[in-house]
A protein has these predicted regions:
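N-terminal, charged low-complexity regulatory/assembly segments
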Residues: 2-227
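Functionally constrained cores in energy, signaling, and assembly domains
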Residues: 30, 279, 302
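C-terminal regulatory or interaction extensions
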Residues: 194-278
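Short, leucine-enriched amphipathic alpha-helices that occur as contiguous helical runs
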Residues: 276, 285-288
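Short helix-to-turn junction characteristic of helix-turn-helix DNA-binding domains
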Residues: 280-284, 292-298
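Short capping segments at the starts of secondary-structure elements
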Residues: 298-304
Length: 306
């Protein structure tokens, strides 16, 4: 249901993770395309360290346990890379992979095979809308494969996206079943190697409640209030530790467990970098560059100079 303007939103802040969502975040990162993409937590750590001048010793204690879980799942998941790439690679300009759309369908219609023809069509169209990132009800007119093909052509989809949508239209049940098996395997490995994160999840839930309150627009800017759901569930997120993600199709917000810590670290070293620059203004360019290089390579990197 959609929240009416001015009415309060029912927001539930959970203190536990969603293992299936964690594995989708994990595998999406592995297959995220692009030359600048970070495909594992270690690469994310290097990116954060380089971009914000955060010393490695600040990030390693936070991220190493998560990196070990990620590596354990990726190393032991007995599914071909081709099939993983099919489900977990974002395509075209879509922000998310096919896995999210199918996962929502799995939760909503666990017995897809027993649905009536009209119910199956509605589920397929909802899944495709989510996958294509098009407005709600954009596919309500689609009742046959010809309608779908016409829509895809008008929508300017890539050939890869057209093929996936057509395949889903014909064999949705097979893809739901295959993804369900993959997620069961992945979550089993994930939970098997997961350390105790009880306190971390509680802290994240408390911080999320403080930041969001009863209005997600406090942390998600430029939201269309008219399209907000009446109820939202907020989950702590380990594999999406450094960000916030709102799954509109499922009314879930995934709140990164280190969002607060990383924000504080970025601020801390941003302030120290500004202080360092001001102290070096009177030094010649050559000497200044040599000092900066020494600090960057040394143990005092990130510390203030008195």
């Amino acid at each position: 249901t959609v929240k009416e303007k001015g009415s309060p939103m029912n927001i539930q802040f959970l203190t536990r993770i969603c293992p299936e969502a964690e594995c989708i975040f994990l595998l999406e990162r592995r297959f995220r395309p692009g030359m600048d993409a970070q495909n594992n937590i270690e690469q994310v750590r290097h990116y954060l360290s380089d971009k914000y001048d955060i010393p490695p010793f600040e990030l390693e204690p936070l991220l190493q346990p998560l990196a070990e879980v990620e590596n354990y799942v990726n190393s032991n998941l007995s599914v071909s890379e081709e099939r993983l790439r099919f489900f977990f690679t974002p395509r075209g300009n879509a922000p998310n992979s096919l896995a999210w759309s199918l996962y929502n369908a799995i939760k909503q219609d666990s017995q897809y095979g027993s649905l009536s023809g009209s119910q199956k069509l509605r589920t397929v169209n909802q899944t495709l809308q989510h996958f294509l990132d098009v407005p709600e009800n954009a596919l309500d007119h689609v009742t046959c494969i010809n309608d779908l093909v016409q829509f895809l052509m008008k929508n300017g989809c890539t050939e890869d996206v057209k093929w996936v949508c057509t395949a889903l239209y014909y064999s949705m049940d097979e893809y739901l079943e295959e993804l369900d098996v993959i997620l069961r395997k992945a979550t089993g490995l994930f939970l098997e190697h997961l350390p105790d994160v009880t306190d971390l999840c509680r802290q994240t839930a408390a911080y999320a409640k403080e930041q969001i309150g009863d209005d997600p627009s406090r942390v998600f800017l430029n939201l269309n209030v008219a399209t907000q759901p009446s109820a939202v569930t907020v989950y702590p997120c380990l594999m999406g530790f450094h960000g916030l993600s709102w799954d509109f199709a499922d009314s879930r917000i995934y709140f990164g467990v280190y969002y607060e810590a990383l924000t504080n670290l970025i601020q801390k070293y941003s302030d120290q970098s500004a202080s360092l620059v001001s102290r070096l203004k009177s030094i010649g360019d050559k000497s200044r560059l040599e000092i900066l290089r020494s600090l960057k390579a040394g143990e005092c990197n990130g510390q203030d100079i008195s």
